[in-house]
Amino acid sequence: MIIGASEGLSSSSAKSEVKFKYFHNTSASLIHKSISEMAKFVKHYGGKSDTVYGLAGLGDLYVSAIGGRNSQMGKYLGEGFLYKEAKKKFMDEVTVEGAELAIEVGKKLKQDLNEKDFPLMLSIIECICENKKLEISW
């Protein structure tokens, strides 16, 4: 459950690189940062860190990032759409698990997590929960 929560939020960021000029390098950096934050997230909540590097973590992040609903939403957020606008325009009838999770637990995570350690995850949460443009503070 812990790794699923972390992966859902992380995969939303993996496709958000489209707003950056050098998107391949940025995409690689986002994936690296996602994995790093997933490991910290799992440790913070008492999960097993090695899960991050297995199929439930890295494997699921890869699958989600190359074509899942979370990464599709991340692409729209990276293109500059607000969450509510992108949801209504492109994914109105689609469940985006990472976004649903952010809405459900975002407030608690913002209280629990340090922005220095989780800039990517907290940027995604803020973007979705507060319907703001995606700005990654890393």
Predicted segment positions?
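Mobile gating loops/cap/lid regions near enzyme active sites that modulate substrate access
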Residues: M1-I2, S11
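NAD(P)-dependent Rossmann-like dehydrogenase/reductase catalytic/cofactor-binding core
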Residues: I3, E7, Y22-A28, H32-I35, ...
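Inter-helical turn/loop segments and adjacent helix faces that build the functional surface
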Residues: S12-N25
